[in-house]
Amino acid sequence: MPRSLKKGPFIDLHLLKKVEKAVESGDKKPLRTWSRRSTIFPNMIGLTIAVHNGRQHVPVFVSDEMVGHKLGEFAPTRTYRGHAADKKAKKK
């Protein structure tokens, strides 16, 4: 369910300050964040944000198609290793 329009998009203040500082200085170094719940804003376009997935920080380069989505959508938390092989079929 989407967030109410009267509330507006959510972004953590500490992340917003980091983004504004990086845009102001023109720094291209990745911004490390644990805030997966923050919405991607238009002023983040062109920045690389390292989003934590529970184990490591995944670098996410923000493009214009990502605006309005959450940062956590681009840093998967689960790794799929496939289903277990059938032991009977393997034996023959």
Swiss-Prot record:
Position of the signal peptide: none
Write out the function statement from the record.
Protein S19 forms a complex with S13 that binds strongly to the 16S ribosomal RNA.
Record InterPro entries: Ribosomal_uS19, Ribosomal_uS19_bac-type, Ribosomal_uS19_CS, Ribosomal_uS19_SF
Example of a GO MF term: structural constituent of ribosome
Q: Which PROSITE patterns match?
A: RIBOSOMAL_S19
What start-end ranges are recorded for coiled-coil regions in this protein? none
Q: Species name for this entry?
A: Salmonella typhimurium (strain LT2 / SGSC1412 / ATCC 700720)
Protein keywords: Ribonucleoprotein, Ribosomal protein, RNA-binding, rRNA-binding
State the Gene Ontology BP annotations.
ribosomal small subunit assembly; translation
Q: Tell me which family the UniProt entry assigns to this protein.
A: Belongs to the universal ribosomal protein uS19 family.
Q: What Gene Ontology terms describe where this protein resides (cellular component)?
A: cytoplasm; small ribosomal subunit
Which gene specifies this protein's sequence? rpsS
Q: What is this protein called?
A: Small ribosomal subunit protein uS19
